Amino acid sequence: MAKVFIFDSAKCNGCRNCQLACKDEHVDNEWLPYAMPQPDTGQFWTSIEEKVRGQVPKVKLSYIAKRCQHCDNAPCMKVAPEAVYKREDGLVIIDPEKAKGKKELVDACPYNAIFWNYELEIPQKCTGCAHLVDAGELPHCVDVCPHQALRFGDEEEFAEEIAQAEAFLPERAELDKPRTYYLNMPKRFVAGIVIDPEQDEVLIGAKMTLQNVETEEVYTTQT
């Protein structure tokens, strides 16, 4: 059964438990045939990026998980098909033995999710904790998320969420066919106070329409 990752930005509070769990699972641990140990520094197979919008005093902070997308049509597989493969469950794996010396795989990933291990001279990335999945367990990053912002499971199980989801890089979604789906990604942030000058009071529930003078894009929001 094909697996997918679901990340909901609205549920993420930036605790970075997933980021630490990945380090805990992979630093100094060898999980062959899927992965050699991850270095202490220089690599984050799962990381949380901050997205800051607005300006003081109206600021909105959101978080986005940056990770391997486990694409069905993975660019890295095209560059080194003998060293990168997709499992039946959809997880994309870089074979640590066959990929030795193939630094070109780092640049092949448009999501910047592949890292170079200078000591071992191999490219490395998220394996989806394939060794845990094989044992019927969840990837460590998913297991430690306290708010279920990051989930993992059968594609059919998340059909409703997938229908509403976005891609990390929308412009590459059709080409790469990523198996990591994003919900509630940060959008345009409009902030301010609307006042009725006649009543001299703040309006609540007023519908606002704004237009970008450069792009002519129109946005609507409610106070």
Q: Where is each model-derived feature located?
A:
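Hydrophobic alpha-helical membrane-insertion signals
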Residues: 15-21, 25-26, 30
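Flanking helices and flexible, charged tails adjoining ferredoxin-like Fe-S electron-transfer domains
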Residues: 30-67, 72, 78, 93-193
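Exposed beta-strand and adjacent loop surfaces of beta-rich binding modules
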Residues: 189, 205-207
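Structural motif
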Residues: 193-203
